[in-house]
Amino acid sequence: MTVLLGVAHGSRDEAAQEVVRTLLDAAGERLGVLALPAYIDNASPSIALALEGLAIAGHDDVVVLPLLLNAAGHSKTDVAGSVQRARLDHPQLRLHYGRPFGAHPSVVTVLEQRLVEAGAADRPVVLVAGGSLDPDANATVAATARLLWEGRAHPTVDVAFVSATGPTVEEALLRAPDAVVSLLFLGPGYLPNKATTAAGDRIVSAPLGAAPELVDLIVERYREALGNDVRMNCDACL
């Protein structure tokens, strides 16, 4: 039986880990497979330990999915590198590597749901993400912002970042002082907390969380990977 290994960024916040477990439990039930978490940092198990455990347990077919919102260094280098090393260390494992969530309509739908829940369905928005030195990853955030604006009631949707690049949340809110803040993060943790602090007294919508739409997306990415139908811009991949 194929195993789904969902790789999240990792957080010391137990609530963030619970989001990952809930998503994977639901996706595993939908697919009829064992679905387990692994983390890049700040939580365990690591990708290497998780894959080693699966090999020792006798599993021979694993789909590794980055539960990440864009294709930054984590998915292109950290997770990809771990998969590459595991192929050498555990040649009995067939490893299929999927792509991250990206600027997918399911992500945009959940972002809008969180804004509606916050009473901000028709307000200007600053979409806040983690930020990366990889321009491809930052462009994905910009594409997500554009999709959030298209066909919806938000007058503007701008982007801001809490690490690695700009504009910062403070800079974006200077340009859009009446905007609400939308968190492009899977769950709670250090970076979303940093964004919330930077927002001051402005409305901040909740992170994506364990939304059913994201379960659908995990199932979609799993089937892509298992069918060797992964399509993404990999100019900067390992």
Predicted regions: what is each one?
Residues 1-238:
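Active-site-proximal alpha-helix that buttresses catalytic centers in soluble enzyme cores
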